[in-house]
Amino acid sequence: SFLYYNTLGLASSSGKTFKNSKTKLTNSISSFFTFFKSKYDLKTETYRIFGFSGGSQFVHRYMMYGKDERVEMAAIGSAGWYTFLNNEPFPFGITNMPIDKNRLDWFLSREVLFILGKNDNDPNHSSLNSNYGAKKQGAHRHQRGESYFNNLINYAEINEMPFRWRFRSVEGLDHNIEEMTKNAAPFLLSGLEY
């Protein structure tokens, strides 16, 4: 069981870090990709990934703390909270779990579509993290997402790092995976022959 999959098994959603976790997921997708690449004789060296809500939390932290550099593109949306590039403790920030500069360069330079629903603004949503660290990021998912995206822009500018993420706020969209997928799919499928 991966109760804390959204933090890669590195911390609880309240911020308690796990130093010796045997269930760290920092290389999990890479292992699956390697297996399927071998089993089906896939010729590609990269893959594209999508995460919604808790999956979005997983994907952005996987890209931050993972060892895998085979993610070509990602689309993430509607996370309830994020790991900011700031001095907050993990999983809300990186102060006690720093990231190597080369990894940050890689993370910020990936092609990522960051999608928020304009109507994903319920501060009392049943699955929204209501811990103090998450509430500091904003009242609801849309606010927290805007804050996170702006944090990444500012970090990249201050540190003169490339930033290739795209922001999309979708009118009328609430916390809905089907509609989020419709917005992510054209981006993730662009340029593929299928």
Q: Which residue ranges define each predicted feature?
A:
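The feature captures the conserved acid-bearing segment of alpha/beta-hydrolase catalytic domains
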Residues: 72-73, 79-157
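Short glycine-enriched nucleophile-adjacent loop
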Residues: 56-67, 184
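Extracellular/periplasmic catalytic domains that process cell-envelope and extracellular macromolecules
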Residues: 42-43, 67-69, 104-109, 160-161
